[in-house]
Amino acid sequence: MRCKQRVRTTELVDGFRHSAPYVNAHRGKTFVVMLGGEALAQNQFRGILNDVALLHSLGIKVVLVYGARPQIDAALAANGIEPAYHDGVRITDEDSLKVIKQVAGALQFDITARLSMSLSNTPMQGAQINLVSGNFVIAQPLGVDNGVDFCLSGKVRRIDAQGLKRQLDNHCIVLMGPIAASVTGESFNLTAEEIATQVAIKLKADKMIGFSSQNGILDRNGDVIAELMPNDAQKILNKLAEQGSACIGTMAFLKASIDACRNGVPRCHLVSYLDDGALLQELFSREGIGTQIVTESAERLRRASISDIGGILNLIRPLEEQGILVRRSREQLEIEIEQFMLIERDGLVIGCAALYPFEEDNAGEFACLVVHPDYRDADRGSLLLKNIIGQARSRGYSRLFALTTRSIHWFLEHGFVIEDVDALPQKKKQLYNYQRRSKILALDL
């Protein structure tokens, strides 16, 4: 008998546990995944397709739209045909369309073959995926623009949403390429971004997902912007267009995301095709890894309720154990819960603060300010303070005070000044703990 030594690791267990809420949340939802030609040209595209298969196995309805921009350019050049563009849109003549059909067909076979694999010791073992393609998109010609004839370049005329839904309900992955037919029986070359956008809109998809060479949209410091509203995304798109330095695929998907969000798709995600597992990390972790363009923020600031007590206790308990916060019992929190504001992200309480009234002194106490350690990079504490200040002013308070042992400079940076114990309201002064020796700070409102 041979015994195998087993190494115990908590990473896999922790990963499963942390992803479980997202597995449950995504089950039965519809995702439109757009793989541009740039992504398909990378070795990592096999891993991406494995991850798409995993989404399918978790009960997610997947429409996979692929593009072929670099592959088409290379094939045209190999056939002695100069690629022609106008305003970033390909001009497709009859000779070009023949080549484009060959390229699109080859890519379709490659993707189908990869998603049909079920070898042992591979991520696709036992997958048994049914892949469906068809005439779900009806095209029409782009026509002539400013004297430029786009010939056989087309755009979406309509989407067979009911046909798509039937296939998705039958547990199929729908695969869609850049070639679509018109009502006259002609074939047209469309952009993958437009197909993905229109499919997502017509299906009322829950997400549209795209890939770029970067992990999303970067700010001026080179850091990934986690979340953008459509109007902010439009400003960034305009700036990127002026600079002319951004990847064509990135700009095209950003534009498509803005259009999709403005037409009812709640969230669009942009992740890197170079980062192995980026798709899964974006969808099944609270932090994500790329950029979301959203119609409504994943985070929201709201007043706490009784059901939030467990989340608040989990947030403040580590600081209580370190002696940074005064310990609060569950019973005390139940009594004081209406004084609390919190920041919630995907069901997790990631920040909280309280405003305790001292009406007889026309003052309020700013207390129990806590932000989760993983979310201290976006000035959420200032957001909570701003909200509490607004509440205090609306109640007519003239002063806001706070007690702290560790965050003196943070309060000073936000306009507070150091006071002595005698400056406290009488009731608070009677409860002051001289052993903790908390610093007293106040802000005139």
From Swiss-Prot:
Q: What InterPro entries does this protein map onto? A: AceGlu_kinase-like_sf (IPR036393), Acyl_CoA_acyltransferase (IPR016181), Asp/Glu/Uridylate_kinase (IPR001048), GNAT_dom (IPR000182), NAGS_kin (IPR033719), NH2A_AcTrfase (IPR010167)
| BP GO terms, sorted | L-arginine biosynthetic process
- Has UniProt tagged this entry with the keyword Ion transport? no
Q: Which domain of life is it from?
A: Bacteria
Q: Where in the cell is it found?
A: Cytoplasm
Q: Which GO terms describe its molecular function?
A: L-glutamate N-acetyltransferase activity
Transmembrane ranges? none
What keywords tag this UniProt record?
Acyltransferase, Amino-acid biosynthesis, Arginine biosynthesis, Cytoplasm, Transferase
* Protein's pathway: Amino-acid biosynthesis; L-arginine biosynthesis; N(2)-acetyl-L-ornithine from L-glutamate: step 1/4
What reaction gets catalysed by this protein? L-glutamate + acetyl-CoA = N-acetyl-L-glutamate + CoA + H(+)
Q: What is its EC number?
A: 2.3.1.1
Domain N-acetyltransferase stretches? 299-445
This protein's GO CC annotations: cytoplasm
Family note:
Belongs to the acetyltransferase family. ArgA subfamily.
Additional facts recorded: In bacteria which possess the bifunctional enzyme ornithine acetyltransferase/N-acetylglutamate synthase (ArgJ), ArgA fulfills an anaplerotic role.
Q: Which PANTHER family match?
A: AMINO-ACID ACETYLTRANSFERASE, AMINO-ACID ACETYLTRANSFERASE NAGS1, CHLOROPLASTIC-RELATED
> Which HAMAP family does UniProt cross-reference here?
N_acetyl_glu_synth (MF_01105)
Mind telling me what this protein is named? Amino-acid acetyltransferase
